[in-house]
Amino acid sequence: YVDTNVMAGRAGDYNPATERFSNVIYMPCTAENNFCPELPKETPDIIYLCFPNNPTGEAITKEQLQVWVDYANKTGAVIIYDAAYKAYITEKDIPVSIYQCEGAKTCAIELCSFSKTAGFTGLRLAYTVIPKELKCGDVQLHALWARRHGTKYNGAPYIIQRAGEAVYSKDGKAQIAEQIAYYHKNASYIFNGLKEAGYTVAGGVNSPYVWLKTPDQMNSWEFFDYLLEKANVVGTPGSGFGPSGEGYFRLTAFGTYENT
């Protein structure tokens, strides 16, 4: 989310010492707040939320999400809600869409990629929901989006659309459910194994990702080197996800059970 705003010239000046951009309001997701960001003190124009979250693997309840919807409606901010991992939700109190919250249609845009649901990474197929009730001032964002999209994009290639169609077929749904259950098994194996080994871990229940605290005061890249050299395992250093990711590490369930 930061990178797209940097490329669009909206992020402001970068401070190497703090690793932050001047126009970006950072919302830490750490163990101290149970990986659920607190409402910002500054008033934002756009709020990016991703739940179940990448990289932490954590999810929030409908009640917690309703707080953000109410805040956005009160302040006039627009929420861009990334639901890419909703297919991995297992707990009943976790919303699969922001539109389950009252008032969301007047403040939220929802995105969802097929990449994680159906293994479509690289095929570039997703959907965007922009309610007609959503306005900035007197301007309807749906109308602006439709004009922009119709001018700059002719739609996904036909063969990829047919793949997307198959996702919603009876066989497609069954195959996807089987695949997701397979990855959940991997995530559970990683989560429980790390916990038994004494690591502090999060995620892995409503998500394919397990987020762990690096041991022995190692930073993220030191732990990356340690895992690579000692166990021949590659993971993702938490520092790559922003300032609050330092000291954490992401492992993925997207592999074979044997390798996991």
Task: Please describe what each predicted stretch is.
Residues 1-260:
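PLP-dependent class I/II
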